[in-house]
């Protein structure tokens, strides 16, 4: 708990004021606690100085002393605060009163020296005055006036400070000054000369560099003219960028699966001896279905027989077959077909024939698919990326399929165009 200064406040304040008043004979005041409480009370005051105050200290109590003494150096009044903790005070009380020191220091303001004492050796008057002397600042001594006016007797005349001029020393001094002035001037000239030479060397280097660049530019221009074309640095840079872009495109295209299939197809076309390009497959039975549906069943086997030969154009021909017969057969099978869109785009023409016609159409379609090689039905929509691929919609039929790779096949699309398509976009028809 904090120290209580309000209970005995007037008495405490009165004792403090009597000590700090310079004309008051009271020069010390002693404060302590009331029993084991935290209430501060006045233990005593006196006019006998430090010797009298020391005798009032009790070794079994916690006490606070505030004294007025004279500075031995300046003779000015100084105030000393002594925090006394007797040797007989128990540890619990010491711990409780340790926080009251700052409270008492705030109440007893103006102390020049603060002493924490526990034994009589710490509060001896000589020891206290020594600390006061050290706290007053520098250890100086004040001169005391022995007399305002003193007759010290006649004073001797003031001596002259005139010195005769020495010509030799003067000449030496002047010569020395001129020597240093000349040295400074020479140093300044040397620095200016070095600066001028550096600037001249820099200008010469710049001139040589410009001349060298002009000569190199002239040689390049002459070399370009000799090669038969005028080139500029911008054009050279553009050509380099074109080469880099072309190389990058070639590398990217070499990695793309579609380009791999294109290369395989070109290799197959160059190695084959006489493999004609597959043309658009003409469906004889479709044309005759639209014109003569009643006679279609009689001529369908011929178309079914000739279709497998069209689906395998790369088979090696028989050695005994002359080229003219092969050409004749190809012309018989590969005619310039009309657009096959009518087979898928115009189903109403067939539906107008009635229920009997629909049965005939399904039968004809089954016979046609059986003669067109491997067939598949589209599951998803796919749009061709270039002219080497085919486009189709869901439920479209793809005929004449060639399995050239695990992921990409080739076949005839709904429009009769032959090209590649992704294998996972279709399902095979058994």
Curated annotation (Swiss-Prot):
Q: Which residues carry this modification: Phosphoserine?
A: 160, 232, 269, 272, 275, 283
Q: Which SUPFAM superfamilies match?
A: Actin depolymerizing proteins (SSF55753), SH3-domain (SSF50044)
Q: Which residues carry this modification: Phosphothreonine?
A: 26, 291
Q: Where in the cell is it found?
A: Cytoplasm, Cytoskeleton; Cell projection, Lamellipodium; Cell projection, Ruffle; Cytoplasm, Cell cortex
Basic and acidic residues compositional bias, start-end: 245-267
- Any idea which GO molecular function terms this record carries? actin binding; actin filament binding; cadherin binding; enzyme activator activity; protein domain specific binding; structural constituent of postsynaptic actin cytoskeleton
| Statement: the UniProt record of this protein carries the keyword DNA-binding | no
Compositionally skewed regions (Polar residues) per UniProt:
233-244, 268-277
**How is this chain modified after translation?**
Degraded by caspases during apoptosis.
User: Positions of the region Disordered?
Assistant: 219-283
Write down the membrane topology.
Peripheral membrane protein
Q: Which residues form a coiled coil?
A: 176-231
Q: By its UniProt entry, which CDD domains does this protein fall under?
A: ADF_drebrin_like, SH3_Abp1_eu
Please tell me whether the keyword Cytoplasm is annotated for this protein: yes
Q: Could you give the subunit structure recorded for this chain?
A: Interacts with SHANK2, SHANK3 and SYN1. Interacts with FGD1 and DNM1. Interacts with ANKRD54. Interacts with COBL. Interacts with WASL and WIPF1. Interacts with MAP4K1 and PRAM1.
Q: What is this protein called?
A: Drebrin-like protein
Recorded source organism is: Homo sapiens
């Amino acid at each position: 708990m904090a120290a209580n200064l309000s209970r005995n406040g007037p008495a405490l304040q009165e004792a403090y004021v009597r000590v700090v008043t310079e004309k008051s004979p009271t020069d010390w005041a002693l404060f302590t606690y009331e029993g084991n409480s935290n209430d501060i009370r006045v233990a005593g005051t006196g006019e006998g100085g430090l010797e009298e105050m020391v005798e009032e200290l009790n070794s079994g109590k916690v006490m606070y002393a505030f004294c007025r003494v004279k500075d031995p150096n300046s003779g000015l009044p100084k105030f000393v605060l002594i925090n006394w903790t007797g040797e007989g005070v128990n540890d619990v009380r010491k711990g409780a009163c340790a926080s009251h020191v700052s409270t008492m220091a705030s109440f007893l303001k103006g102390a020049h020296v603060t002493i924490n004492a526990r034994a009589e050796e710490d509060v001896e008057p000589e020891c206290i005055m020594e600390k006061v002397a050290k706290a007053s600042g520098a250890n100086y001594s004040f001169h005391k006036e022995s007399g305002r006016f003193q007759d010290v007797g006649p004073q001797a005349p003031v001596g002259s400070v005139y010195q005769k001029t020495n010509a030799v020393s003067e000449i030496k001094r002047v010569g020395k000054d001129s020597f240093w002035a000349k040295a400074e001037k020479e140093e300044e000239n040397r620095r200016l000369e070095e600066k001028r030479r550096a600037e001249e060397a820099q200008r010469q280097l710049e001139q040589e560099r410009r001349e060298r660049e002009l000569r190199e530019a002239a040689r390049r221009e002459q070399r370009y003219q000799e090669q038969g074309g005028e080139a500029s640095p911008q054009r050279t840079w553009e050509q380099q960028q074109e080469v880099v872009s072309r190389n990058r495109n070639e590398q990217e295209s070499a990695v793309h699966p579609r380009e791999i299939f294109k290369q395989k197809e070109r290799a197959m076309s160059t190695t084959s001896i006489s493999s004609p390009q597959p043309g658009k497959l003409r469906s004889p039975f479709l044309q005759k279905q639209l014109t003569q549906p009643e006679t279609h069943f009689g001529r369908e086997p011929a178309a079914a027989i000739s279709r497998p030969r069209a689906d395998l154009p790369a088979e090696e021909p028989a050695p005994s077959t002359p080229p003219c017969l092969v050409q004749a057969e190809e012309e018989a099978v590969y005619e310039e077909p009309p657009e096959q869109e009518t087979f898928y785009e115009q189903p109403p023409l067939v539906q107008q024939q009635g229920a009997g016609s629909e049965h005939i159409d399904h039968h004809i379609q089954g016979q046609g698919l059986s003669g067109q090689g491997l067939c598949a039905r589209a599951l998803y929509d796919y749009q061709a990326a270039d002219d080497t691929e085919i486009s189709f919609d869901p439920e479209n039929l793809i005929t004449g399929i060639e399995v050239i790779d695990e992921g990409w096949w080739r076949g005839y699309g709904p429009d009769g165009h032959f090209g590649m398509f992704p294998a996972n976009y279709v399902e095979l028809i058994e």
